[in-house]
UniProtKB/Swiss-Prot annotation:
It comes from the Eukaryota. Component of the commander complex that is essential for endosomal recycling of transmembrane cargos; the commander complex is composed of the CCC subcomplex and the retriever subcomplex. Component of the retriever complex, which is a heterotrimeric complex related to retromer cargo-selective complex (CSC) and essential for retromer-independent retrieval and recycling of numerous cargos such as integrin alpha-5/beta-1 (ITGA5:ITGB1). The recruitment of the retriever complex to the endosomal membrane involves CCC and WASH complexes. Component of the commander complex that is essential for endosomal recycling of transmembrane cargos; the commander complex is composed of the CCC subcomplex and the retriever subcomplex. Component of the heterotrimeric retriever complex consisting of VPS26C, VPS29 and VPS35L; within the complex interacts with VPS35L. Interacts with SNX17 (via C-terminus); the interaction is direct and associates SNX17 with the retriever complex. Interacts with SNX31; the interaction is direct. It comes from Pongo abelii. GO terms for cellular component: endosome. Keywords: Endosome. The keyword Glycoprotein does not apply. It is found in: Endosome. Its main location: other. One of its GO terms (biological process) is endocytic recycling. The gene is VPS26C. This is Vacuolar protein sorting-associated protein 26C. InterPro entries: Arrestin-like_C, Ig_E-set, Vps26-related.
Amino acid sequence: MGTALDIKIKRANKVYHAGEVLSGVVVISSKDSVQHQGVSLTMEGTVNLQLSAKSVGVFEAFYNSVKPIQIINSNIEMVKPGKFPSGKTEIPFEFPLHVKGNKVLYETYHGVFVNIQYTLRCDMKRSLLAKDLTKTCEFIVHSAPQKGKFSPSPVHFTITPETLQNARERALLPKFLLRGHLNSTNCVITQPLTGELVVESSEAAIRSVELQLVRVETCGCAEGYARDATEIQNIQIADGDVCRGLSVPIYMVFPRLFTCPTLETTNFKVEFEVNIVVLLHPDHLITENFPLKLCRI
């Protein structure tokens, strides 16, 4: 075994909030004593924006504004050049999570075109003959709970061929009537999206009913903006020809890291929507879209 470098964060779930202190230890393990040129630790939080393929070309001028946005950056020298004994050495560290000026610690979010990530990177410099060692570890930031009282916003819906937006498809569709409700389109991110759906009537047999959670990411600047919708998850809530008049429960948990409270800044936006998708025989697809507002309380 050579020399191994590891970062251990004190909290098992690695979740922190603005104003708290991130603490842990850097662990150096080696069979023999290790000569080194210093050990440093860097904490960094960045927003990485990326353009989709369909936007590239339209926004060449736009490349300049898509460089990573730095939220927080801090560096400490943990150990000056010297030697570590054989065995295991633990070096404690603490970083206060404070941002400078008017910057905000956005919530950790792993998207397709918007990525908000916080990392710790430990570097051990060594002599020319030995390779430098680096270890990176991600920690998670949750945004502050929203101020004010949370008020749910229930939505009742009726889906028929007449309510669909595409008029050409409308004429080709068999007759159907679906009713239902979502208990709230204002959603607490730690609680499931709930509601119910009832198939009142349908001339064609139903193949499947699905719930599709969609992220809508917008990257923008003075030259224009790119808005892209991509699927996060798809859940089947009914399989086969659903009994008419039967209440089908709608229940969807928001996945951690892939969702965050709805976010709007000058450079980017992260929004969420849910689609109720009904597949009819032989090959008809019916989609009803509901914008969601996610928050943390």
